[in-house]
Amino acid sequence: MTQMKLDKGTPLLYPRPQEVKWKSGEFIIGPDTKICVVSEANLYIAKLLQEEIQDLFGIFIPLETNVSNSHILIGRKNQGLKAEGYALSVSQDGMKLLGADDSGVIYGIQTILQLAIKNHQGYLTFPAVDIIDHPNMPIRGVHLYIPAQESIEGFKRLIRMLAYVKMNTLIIEVGGGMEYDRHPEINQAWEKLCKDAQAYPGGPRGIQSSGVYWKNSLHTELGGGSYLTKGEVRDIVDYAKGLGFKVVPEIQGLSHAYYLTMAHREIAEDPEDPFPDTYCPSNPDTYRLYFDVADEVIEVFEPEWVSIGHDEVRMLAQCPLCKDKTGEELLANDINTLYNYFKAKGIKVIMWGEKLQNFIGYNGKPYGGVFQERWDEKGRYWRVPETYKAINLVPKDILMLDWYHMLSEETESEFEKEGFKEFFGNFRGSMIANWDIRSSRNNLLGAQVSTWCLADEYTIARNNTIFEFLFSAGILWTEDYNDTMWEDECWMVVRLMPAIKEMLQGRRYSLSGGNENGFKTFHMDNTVEVIKWGSDIEFSHVFMGDNVKCFNPFAMDDVDIAVDSNVNTLIFLHAVLEPMKFIPSWDFVDMSEYLLGGYEVIFEDGSIEDIELHYGIHLGQMDMEWTRYRGQDDEAPVEVDDLTGEGAQTSTKIPPYYNPKEPWAGSLMYFTIPVRAHINGKIKTLYAYEWINPYPDKKVVSVRAKDTSNQRVLLFGLAGALL
């Protein structure tokens, strides 16, 4: 593997290409530059490069099929390249991109875009380089809910970003989030469920704990609690396919079936439950309804693969039709019924596979399709029969989605022994241990990162998942990653993050190159240098020195800083002293609990813009630990089925996952630029937050800092990008 040169002047290529050779010189886009294709079959992909360069850099490059006039040549090469691979050569005379297939050409285009530099004269340049590249894993995926209607454009930007880092699979959970012509009552019941869940004591989590067992999560964030038209969903699917994605609709079967059972209680395994999460697998009406829904989903997605769900089955063999059947019989019959339906339509099947598993986790407990029972605090009895023996009763060409890989390093070998291929679900690339060993399994095809939240940029980023998208994309693509490279990989993701944020938000930030008129410092002279290059700063007395503004809840006076300038943005370098507990959005967090205070931007005309400061979004604690740990923890890394009886602890092992020392790290890397500084001889972390001024034509007179919490907020620096 050629080591990349990662200095201030070299573009960051991420994921890291397999082979890179930097050369001297550069290619400059001029007035006569053209994009040419070897054959018209490559024309639609070449248009992608043309459109991206125009969108990102405002430069139009003509496209033609006359190879003799080429400056940028795009085509296919059938020999010498691996699947999805490409060869890219850049010299002073031009660029040549050849892909092993259409996907390879698309990924080569993403690398071209990462190489691009717009210089101070406005010319678009590309450093000379030779690259041979291909992915390590064939499945590099993401699991998302259908977005809310108001988030569709942002959802497309998210897809665009995932293509930029060479992800190739989107699993989109459909549920009640797409209109159904045959069954509009499903959409109506879905909207009602989502509204009722918000009003329920404890919200959706309250519903989950309302019965004798821990019910399936409701996924009420799907579709924003509503649904999209078929045309809107089709537009999203077509957009993703145009960027090279396999788009897999997830049509939940058996479990997580609220979208079906709330509209048709007659098919619920427990129709007396006010919120039934599981359908009856012995009722013929179940499949008539499911197949009607699936027909409409297939019509819109036109998929090669469909995910049928089946995770977290916790209500089985309870109703009169099912109670005399074994667990493996019920599970296998349901899987096979859905499998045969899709196979007849030429569609392959993916499923969450844990109910076909039987293993002991690192914490000594049995997991998967084992027998489960318990009595709740009200004395109610609940049981689920064992189902794991169904693994011998279902087709071997079902692709297993394995989210129990974080409980044991043997789950993939168990599936391999039974003849199944799989990929990891709920993957966190930055946290998995021994990826180099586990990824070498012959039956492991890759992984997907899950979101389980509103499909919008803010929520996904706050849950640290944008960071996980990037890190996971890197190690799924590159062949040589191992645990010793974690810190370097994190550093590359941090360096890439500003460009990713601009892509997702559709706007430029001054700190990442979007400012041409320089900066002006209003507090701490070297604020910008510290943020950009990590320059050391020393404060001998944090609370009393002239270099820091400390505003606290016990001070009577607000802190004012003179600006007296027209600015495009204001950049705050700040931090707090105490950490706050991280709660992910799927636990339905109240963000007002994280409100620390804010800034008032005062304009010359007397108007004021308020900037709220939320912990984990705009700033974090100074004593941030940017590391991870691996060891025995009292809690499993993720929510798993609650086991009793024979699930008593029998042995312990080191978890196959690391845990972050700082649970806010991914969020803060996205929303701010973390800055390491020396304060009183100790390394501390400050956070640069850039606020975009909605009224750049109005002069900013001053900035006033205000506290509203019991936290002490420290403002170390303030700068502005001049208009």
Language-model features: locations:
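Contiguous, structured surface segment used for ligand recognition
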Residues: M1-P138, I146, F603
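Substrate-binding groove of N-acetylhexosamine-processing glycoside hydrolases
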Residues: L6-R16, V20-W22, I29, L43, ...
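Feature activates predominantly on carbohydrate-active enzymes
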Residues: E40, Q79-K345, I350
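Flexible loop/turn segments at secondary-structure boundaries
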Residues: L43-Y44, Q149-S151, G177-D181, L254-L260, ...
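A structural signal for short, well-ordered beta-strand segments and their strand-loop junctions
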Residues: L98, T169-E173, V248-E250, S307-G309, ...
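An acidic- and aromatic-residue-enriched active-site/binding cleft used to recognize and process polar
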Residues: P147, M167, V174-G177, E185, ...
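Charged, glycine/proline-rich intrinsically disordered loops and linkers
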Residues: H183-G223, Y362-K389, V640-Y670
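N-terminal/edge-of-domain interface segments
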Residues: K501-L723
